[in-house]
């Protein structure tokens, strides 16, 4: 079946807006389709036609956490936010730490996901940090990469072994960097906010010391080491130095760490509680600078839904994490592109081709022959963030009430429309 997306514009290699019709056949982008062969047509007049967004850090919670989110609700949220490919973190119950569990997870993905879902496998059995999983069997079963995200690998020897195993299979080790001996039972960053509210704080070095250790281990193992949700200036410096030394390290940053710091926390609202925590303003500034200079490779949401009951607890007792799939692009476009800090092309690249290239994925592009994963965006449309409108089960966001521009209007995965607003017609 052939389709034509007409009237929109794309960004060329220089970031210039160019009017472009996009032709789709059999789920792939093609150069042209004869008018007589077109069976569906979308009116994208005035819309940016972007490659579908790629998010390599999403918590879908299923199996075991279906009260927070399911594969179905999480991928519907992804589609609404313009994401066509997401990678699902393994901190579920049970953990996908063997081929059988990974097979069951992939069957569930096939049944209920509305966007493409790539499953992570865990580095260690049950994510306990004590025994390596069977990397070879998990790769053969379809693992995207290996991570124990949610907890850090505490033993250097265990991490080195994991990196050697992954390197032999040309797979990435993806790390949540946190030294348990330095957490201090903290709920927020160890800074002036913690002091003012009498709270235990998590120091910056809790994250940075693991990165400093791991880049040396990655060098020794010859592994691709990817750092999740970088949050501190020390981490940025360490990654920058490692890249200069030729170590194969990549890194991501979340929208919330780019947008917020501890100064922005309102009262003791648990919707401002995430891990890693919101750091100092100089850390936030270092993250923006690191993204701009290439130290940080791309943006990932760390979408982490929780129930309203869980997030209604005190700041000290509520779980870490916020949702992000449905707010990422509008927030970043409004607060970084419109003021001129980022170009539109930079933002699109950090959400598409950059994560795809980092993990050797054939997505995030509008090239002929690529999967027809498209996100159609009205850059002039405005909305106020309203959690009651989220398709995610999780409503836990610190951005409620924020006004944003740049609203996704439709999302297509392999040529199939998985999300749309009213203006997309003639399906």
Curated annotation (Swiss-Prot):
Substrate binds at residues 59-61, 91, 275, 306, 320-321. Zn(2+) 2 binds at residues 149, 176, 229. PROSITE patterns: DIHYDROOROTASE_1, DIHYDROOROTASE_2. InterPro entries: Amidohydro-rel, DHOase, DHOase/Allantoinase_Hydrolase, Dihydroorotase_CS, Metal-dep_hydrolase_composite, Metal_Hydrolase. Zn(2+) 1 binds at residues 57, 59, 149, 302. One of its GO terms (molecular function) is allantoinase activity. Coiled coil: none annotated. The keyword Cytoplasm does not apply. Gene3D superfamilies: Metal-dependent hydrolases, Urease, subunit C, domain 1. One of its GO terms (biological process) is 'de novo' UMP biosynthetic process. Pathway: Pyrimidine metabolism; UMP biosynthesis via de novo pathway; (S)-dihydroorotate from bicarbonate: step 3/3. The active site is at 302. Its cofactor is Zn(2+). Pfam families: Amidohydro_1 (PF01979). Its EC number is 3.5.2.3. Binds 2 Zn(2+) ions per subunit. It comes from the Bacteria. Keywords: Hydrolase, Metal-binding, Pyrimidine biosynthesis, Zinc. It catalyses: (S)-dihydroorotate + H2O = N-carbamoyl-L-aspartate + H(+). Belongs to the metallo-dependent hydrolases superfamily. DHOase family. Class I DHOase subfamily. HAMAP family: PyrC_classI_B. NCBIfam families: PRK09357.1-2, pyrC_multi. Catalyzes the reversible cyclization of carbamoyl aspartate to dihydroorotate. This is Dihydroorotase. It comes from Shouchella clausii (strain KSM-K16) (Alkalihalobacillus clausii). The lineage of its organism: Bacteria, Bacillati, Bacillota, Bacilli, Bacillales.
